[in-house]
Amino acid sequence: MTNWFARPVLHVTDVDASLRFFVNRLGFTSPWRYQQDGKAHVAQVDRQGCALILADTWPEKIGKGLIFISLNVEPATREAATAALDALRAELQANDAPVKEGSWGYRLLVVDDPDGNQLFFNYPSDPNETASGNMVRDEA
């Protein structure tokens, strides 16, 4: 069996500045970077199984990224997921990360990186809210 592993790319103006943001404000680590003449042009940041690539290689794509990041919480309850996201919000705010509320038909915690790329963390849906649509899952 082969497992797939995705690493989305966020296009940024300055990889070194973005590394400082993701490491110092968002709590990621950086296992590697590609440099030329002492300047990083591509790097990876990781946090708890979430890996992102930062690159300055396509200027026309800078700041146009949007990534959904889900937290797998044990036990897998609505209350535990909400508590985990509230704890993440508190951690990020303590590190002066730009955290705001958002919505995608449900509540989001939104973080904008220095270039305007967005990280969306979804809160569990409220079973008491009335949705205008419904989720349809294809049969496997």
Role assignments for model-derived ranges:
Residues V9-L52:
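Core segments of cupin and vicinal oxygen chelate
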Residues V12-D16, I67-Q118, Y123:
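Vicinal oxygen chelate
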Residues D37-H41, I62-G63, S103-R107:
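Short acidic/glycine-enriched loop/turn segments that link adjacent beta-strands
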Residues G49-I53, G116-L119:
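Short, charged/polar, Gly/Pro-enriched secondary-structure boundary elements
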